[in-house]
């Protein structure tokens, strides 16, 4: 679970940290990684590594699976937090469906609740929502004065196709962007731990219109990066991927940045007053979205302050604890089992009919 690689890692670690701060013992459990599971990058968070997935069955307390719906028995009813959209390949469907049949489901937005309830064919009321959050430092980090005379644009997402990096590359060549010397663009190396990320990194390094800086592996360092930029772009793909939320948008607004984001998935739910929504997968739309953000000027301090009071870690953990304490919905597996038992149970009508045919309990004329 390397730091600086994605929102689900920050979400998980942030929850565990806040739970322990409140005196609620919690830990991050990894499988098959030993001590090389990322714990060295989160020294204030307890980690526990298991040799094999089956060992999860021996854990005490509440077990929360993150993203991967492994069908493993647990001592108590378990939860599953789904940060990603459902898989689009049919070969992955059985794993997703089977692994969620006996779990209490948690998602990160209203959009994700609708998406997963449709995919799994379950009542949307049985899917709980626990919104992500920005760490407090994003709202409190001081913004330095911009003495460059330029508008600084940051792509803070992972270097992966679904985050819209190729749309951004197209946008760099559109006239209203390319011909403006007062625009600067920066991306980080988040995601270069994957092969596709390393390929995209090389493309960006070769491009004269964008700078590449090292990924930030802590909330504090990312807040420092965002507060030296004016606009954060999130041109996420909508063809084969849908952002279920978009925590970078929250972090950016808490940091005092405007956000230009795809009007898709859960991204509209991240608007704290500083989001400009654009048509996804559309370089021209992204270009005009950036221009609109430039024309709007810096995000007002009052908007940043108000944004900083929304989507906090305290609010997120309050919601999580509420999910843990409320009665659990009946799982799909339990419903199927009950239906099977009902089908296999002797019918009352059939039993009564047999009795009547044997001359017990009324005449044949009284049968329905």
Set out the residue ranges of the language-model regions.
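Nucleotide-sugar-dependent
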Residues: 236-249, 268-269
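A short, active-site helix/loop in glycosyltransferases that binds the activated sugar's phosphate group
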Residues: 89-93, 101-126, 134-137
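A conserved mid-protein helix/loop that constitutes part of the nucleotide-sugar donor-binding site
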Residues: 10-14, 151, 160-174
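Glycosyltransferase donor-sugar binding loop
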Residues: 32-34, 183-198
């Amino acid at each position: 679970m390397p730091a600086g690689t994605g929102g689900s890692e920050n979400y998980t670690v942030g929850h565990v940290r806040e739970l322990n701060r409140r005196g609620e013992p919690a830990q991050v459990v990894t499988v098959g990684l030993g001590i090389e599971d990322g714990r060295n990058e989160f020294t204030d968070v307890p980690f526990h590594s298991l040799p094999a997935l089956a060992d999860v069955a021996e854990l005490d307390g509440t077990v929360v699976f993150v993203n991967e719906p492994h069908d493993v028995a647990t001592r108590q009813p378990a939860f599953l937090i789904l940060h990603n959209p459902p898989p689009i390949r049919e070969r992955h469907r059985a794993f997703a469906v089977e692994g969620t049949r006996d779990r209490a489901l948690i998602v990160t937005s209203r959009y994700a609740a609708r998406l997963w309830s449709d995919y799994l064919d379950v009542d949307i009321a049985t899917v709980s929502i626990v919104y992500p959050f920005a760490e407090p430092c994003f709202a409190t980090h001081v913004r330095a004065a911009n003495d460059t005379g330029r508008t600084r644009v940051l792509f803070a997402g992972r270097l992966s196709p679904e985050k819209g990096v190729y749309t951004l590359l197209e946008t760099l060549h559109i006239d209203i962007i390319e011909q403006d010397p007062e625009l600067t663009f920066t991306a980080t190396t988040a995601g270069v731990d994957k092969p596709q990320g390393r390929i995209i990194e090389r493309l960006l390094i070769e491009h004269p219109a964008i700078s590449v800086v090292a990924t930030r592996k802590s909330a504090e360092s990312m807040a420092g990066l965002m507060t030296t930029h004016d606009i954060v772009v999130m041109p996420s793909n909508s063809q084969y991927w849908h952002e279920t939320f978009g925590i970078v948008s929250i972090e950016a607004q808490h940091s005092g940045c405007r956000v230009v984001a795809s009007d898709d998935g859960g991204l509209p739910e991240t608007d704290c007053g500083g989001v400009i929504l654009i048509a996804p997968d559309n370089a021209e739309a992204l270009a005009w979205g950036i221009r609109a953000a430039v024309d709007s000027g810096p995000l007002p301090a009052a908007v940043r302050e108000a944004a900083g009071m929304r989507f906090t870690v305290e609010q997120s953990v309050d919601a999580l604890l509420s999910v843990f304490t409320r009665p659990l919905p009946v799982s799909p597996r339990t419903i199927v089992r009950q239906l099977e038992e009902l089908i296999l149970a002797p019918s009352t009508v059939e039993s009564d009919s047999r009795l009547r045919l044997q001359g017990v309990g009324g005449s044949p004329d009284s049968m329905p």
